[in-house]
Amino acid sequence: MTEDNNDIVDIVDNIDIVDYISIYQKAYSIVGDKTPLNTDCGVLCSKICCESEYTDGDRGMFLFPEEERMYDDLPYWVELKPTEIEYAPGKNIILAVCNGKCDRERRPLACRIFPLAGVINTDNKLRIIMDIRGKSMCPIVFAMQVDEIDVSFVKSVTKALKYLLPFREIKAFLQYTDELINEDQTINNMFM
């Protein structure tokens, strides 16, 4: 990142003046309509992500910081649930729970990039990894590695997340995501 970009971050990092709607619209457009496989991955899981009866009030996707602004007109198919999970001091994660019939054009970023996740680990670098939290529902998570997923999808996810990195709230969220996934991996390893 250039020094100029760092200056911009310092100027626009005030949550009250950052236009998160435009930011997320841009991130959504970067990912576009790309999917993890060159074919319809919903065939593998009976479209569990977007047309499923596999819904209940506790399963959903974490919204990125301030992404709830994309749902000010709360569509019928999604419910936003505040959690007690803090990704940063005083900053709680909001869970988007759908009724199993999502509008793909309005789905959250976490849904658009699934089964991948972006994390920032202790070396302060963005990494794109398989989101093992989804292994119970997604055969891709269970059976594949990131390098086996469609390259254009991985590149677009990487580009979208790099675009979001200058915003401190989002960077903190990606750092916390790394912690969550590491905890999940540790628990999984205990039972393997």
Residue ranges with predicted function:
Residues 1-192:
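Short loop/turn segments that flank or connect secondary-structure elements
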